[in-house]
């Protein structure tokens, strides 16, 4: 007997796919939603991923959300655009607007979603080392524990 149906957005990603494995192992039905877009993906689902429902779709698309949320009790929202540059608009649209659309649909359509789990972005680790023509080598710090404790996840 299933413990319930879980939708994992970003389900083809590293964290999403491994979350699916664990949820399947512990008795949940799993539905994955992913756009399988490069450069993160090759356009195919991971071959090692266990058998579960897979949906090609985009969290920026209302119809994809509606289709993916049908019959779902739990959402693990991991879908994210990972590169801030060179396309900040796409980064914002996927990461912020896509998440807002999830909550908008749950409320507006009175969906029976019992719990939503949202993960932070990789920004909590800092931007990594890079070379800037003006400033030379730059290696920004990670996020200070004090900021993280206050829920201030993103850089200022």
Where are these regions (language model features)?
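N-terminal Rossmann-like NAD(P)+-binding domain of SDR-like oxidoreductases, especially those catalyzing
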Residues: 1-156
């Amino acid at each position: 007997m299933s413990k319930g149906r879980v939708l994992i957005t970003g389900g083809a990603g590293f964290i999403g796919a491994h979350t699916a494995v664990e949820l399947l192992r512990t008795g949940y039905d799993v539905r994955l939603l992913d756009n399988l877009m490069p450069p993160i993906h090759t356009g195919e689902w991971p071959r090692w991923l266990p058998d579960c429902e897979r949906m090609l779709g985009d969290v920026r698309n209302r119809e994809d959300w509606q289709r993916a949320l049908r019959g779902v009790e739990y959402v693990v929202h991991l879908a994210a655009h990972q590169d801030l540059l060179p396309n900040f608009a796409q980064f914002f649209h996927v990461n912020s607007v896509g998440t807002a659309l999830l909550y908008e649909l749950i409320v507006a359509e009175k969906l029976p979603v019992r719990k939503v789990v949202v993960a932070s972005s990789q920004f909590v680790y800092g931007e990594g080392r890079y070379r800037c023509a003006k400033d030379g080598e730059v290696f920004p710090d990670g996020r200070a524990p004090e900021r993280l404790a206050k829920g201030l996840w993103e850089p200022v």
